[in-house]
């Protein structure tokens, strides 16, 4: 297996890292540039620049101060139950960061002590060697804690933790595109199996040659959307189609969309959002007609939706029915809103389905797969189609996202 870092990746990364309006931004981006390239090729964690550590320390001090304020507030007897609950909720959010901060502060105190020991042991070689060794280990642990804290401070996308919907569609290239769509769909199925994810086929529309015009699946597992979201876009294939008599290489394209699965919609009706009127039913007469206000009309004020029920003799039963109908209608509105949002996301992700705007090229004659966003080429295409080595591209793209977040972290501080 060979992995190549293409020159355009290096130049694009340098241009990216040269952006920024402040000198410390440019310095940070320069550090990120060299570390990002090194991390792609070695899998090592990026080193933290002095500028970044200084910015992070300011954030950590603010967290420590806020934690101290909240701890003091919840111990005050005049604190109301509502304020106590809010403070406790915020403290829970700070808990993991505070554990890391406390570990970091303890390690930094240990480092200060070891530095003093080193300076005092210059005449005792054995003691000096022992102190230097412990100091080196402590410094490495400090770096590890700083890296963990930095990652904990970066903004997180709530959707990353969700399951996802995979949609694959044949684009430019006719039957060959549909055959490649089938290959890619099966690649993700094999990859999901290797990751231990649940892969449930939702729908498949076949072409005349049993390729896939469209195919979709629900993929469930830990942080599935966060791992697969970078697969969205145009995937291009270059190979000799099985229908090609003269052996010419054809270029086709398919689109892949990765959508976060929405949580089941819960319709919560607040009393202040409802206007409930009762009136006499307009039945055909008889003992209960027009004698009691059993009919119920409910208006949902935020939407103006109205439901009237007078089928039952009991006002209580009519009210329950009306609420059930109202909930069903509001649920449908929300479901359609989510569907519309997904459609927009899908459109943004896959574009027109032609070969422009491609994110990855699969060149079968040369046995290579190239991701154009990070300039990485992998020379083992058959393994790739079996669901192997996809993590190489995913991890590189996750790293790029992390570096973007770090750069944003510094520029907004």
Curated annotation (Swiss-Prot):
Residues 1-40 form a transit peptide. GO terms for cellular component: mitochondrion. Keywords: Methylation, Mitochondrion, Protein biosynthesis, Transit peptide. SMART domains: PCRF. It comes from the Eukaryota. InterPro entries: PCRF (IPR005139), Pep_chain_release_fac_I (IPR000352), Pep_chain_release_fac_I_sf (IPR045853), Prokaryotic/Mito_RF (IPR050057), RF-1 (IPR004373). One of its GO terms (molecular function) is translation release factor activity, codon specific. Mostly expressed in seedlings, stems and adult plants, and, to a lower extent, in siliques. Barely detected in etiolated seedlings and roots. This is Peptide chain release factor 1, mitochondrial. The lineage of its organism: Eukaryota, Viridiplantae, Streptophyta, Embryophyta, Tracheophyta.
